[in-house]
């Protein structure tokens, strides 16, 4: 099915589009298998931040331009002495900020993977909430081959997903795995023919959009709290505070302070 995606903002190295409640962020560097630069990542952070704040967006899809690659990780031609060097000549690893944003954004994020999801590209797949893979998808890590590694989500959280033995295999051997192998190890949620991958992804988004956004927000925060330590607890605590602010009980405390009177909290139930 052909659908008309609306461009919400123009970028140099990504696309940011919208369709019926779905925001789609596309890495647009197909000539290098959608490898990212600091600029690519900065643009993705901006787009994800906009999607987070946009009341019309319920679900976010991350993908790569074309059928050959989702993302092949950091562009090694941009790698300098202390990180990836952008137009400002400052070496940085801002992809770590992007990973964290994808984790804490209070909306489901789905990776739509066609072709290669390798290195840092596979880590982006790992940190997304769900993954719809085309049958031509290829997954793997290359860090130890090129003098790099991801000791955060790319290894620790990966081990939570596929198990410690398999995660060590993925990193120590730097092999590549096809879509069915990725499905078997729990790295993706489903595999569909390449020509159907966007249709299936949109279908999953539409199914998700039928459900309570507050419930989904708390479920994501709860699962993150289990794996992300105090940072995960902070996310869930913030969500709880936000929800509390919407109650009459919280408003009574606020209004009493503004009106310089004692709050009347006796009117609210004390649930067991």
Curated annotation (Swiss-Prot):
Reaction equation(s) it catalyzes: 2-succinylbenzoyl-CoA + H(+) = 1,4-dihydroxy-2-naphthoyl-CoA + H2O
Pathway(s) annotated for this protein in UniProt: Quinol/quinone metabolism; 1,4-dihydroxy-2-naphthoate biosynthesis; 1,4-dihydroxy-2-naphthoate from chorismate: step 6/7; Quinol/quinone metabolism; menaquinone biosynthesis
Molecular function terms from GO: 1,4-dihydroxy-2-naphthoyl-CoA synthase activity
Keyword Lyase: yes
GO BP annotations listed: menaquinone biosynthetic process
Top-level enzyme category: lyase
EC id: 4.1.3.36
Protein name as annotated: 1,4-dihydroxy-2-naphthoyl-CoA synthase
PANTHER family in alphabetical order: 1,4-DIHYDROXY-2-NAPHTHOYL-COA SYNTHASE, PEROXISOMAL (PTHR43113:SF1), NUCLEOSIDE-DIPHOSPHATE-SUGAR EPIMERASE (PTHR43113)
Known function: Converts o-succinylbenzoyl-CoA (OSB-CoA) to 1,4-dihydroxy-2-naphthoyl-CoA (DHNA-CoA).
UniProt xrefs under HAMAP family: MenB
Gene3D superfamilies associated with the record: 2-enoyl-CoA Hydratase, Chain A, domain 1 (3.90.226.10), Lyase 2-enoyl-coa Hydratase, Chain A, domain 2 (1.10.12.10)
Residues of the site described as Important for catalysis: 84, 245
Pfam families in UniProt: ECH_1 (PF00378)
Keywords: Lyase, Menaquinone biosynthesis
GO-annotated cellular components: cytosol
Binding positions for hydrogencarbonate per the UniProt entry: 141-143
Cofactors that this protein relies on: hydrogencarbonate
Residues binding substrate: 33, 72-76, 84, 116-120, 142, 148, 245, 260
Species: Staphylococcus epidermidis (strain ATCC 35984 / DSM 28319 / BCRC 17069 / CCUG 31568 / BM 3577 / RP62A)
Classification via PROSITE patterns: ENOYL_COA_HYDRATASE
Family: Belongs to the enoyl-CoA hydratase/isomerase family. MenB subfamily.
């Amino acid at each position: 099915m052909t659908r008309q995606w609306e461009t919400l903002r123009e970028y140099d190295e990504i696309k940011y589009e919208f369709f019926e409640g779905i925001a789609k962020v596309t890495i647009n560097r197909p000539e290098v298998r959608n490898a990212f630069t600091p600029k690519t990542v900065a643009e993705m952070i901006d787009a994800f931040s906009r999607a987070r704040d946009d009341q019309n967006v319920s679900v976010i899809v991350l993908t790569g331009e074309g059928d050959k690659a989702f993302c092949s990780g950091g562009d090694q031609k941009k790698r300098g002495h202390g990180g990836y060097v952008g137009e400002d000549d400052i070496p940085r690893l801002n992809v770590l900020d992007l990973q964290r944003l994808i984790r804490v954004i209070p909306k489901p994020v789905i990776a739509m993977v066609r072709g290669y999801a390798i290195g840092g590209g596979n880590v982006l797949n790992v940190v997304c909430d769900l993954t719809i893979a085309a049958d031509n998808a290829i997954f793997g890590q290359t860090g130890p081959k090129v003098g790099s590694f991801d000791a955060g989500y790319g290894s620790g959280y990966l081990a939570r997903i596929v198990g410690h033995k398999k995660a060590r295999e993925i990193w120590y051997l730097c092999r590549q795995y096809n879509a069915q192998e990725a499905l078997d190890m729990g790295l993706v949620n489903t595999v569909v023919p390449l020509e159907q991958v966007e249709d299936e992804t949109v279908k999953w988004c539409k199914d998700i959009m039928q459900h309570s956004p507050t419930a989904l927000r708390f479920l994501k925060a709860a699962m993150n709290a289990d794996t992300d330590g105090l940072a995960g607890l902070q996310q869930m605590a913030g969500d709880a505070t936000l929800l509390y602010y919407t109650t009459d009980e919280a408003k009574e405390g606020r209004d009493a302070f503004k009106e310089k009177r004692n709050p009347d909290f006796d009117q609210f139930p004390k649930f067991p």
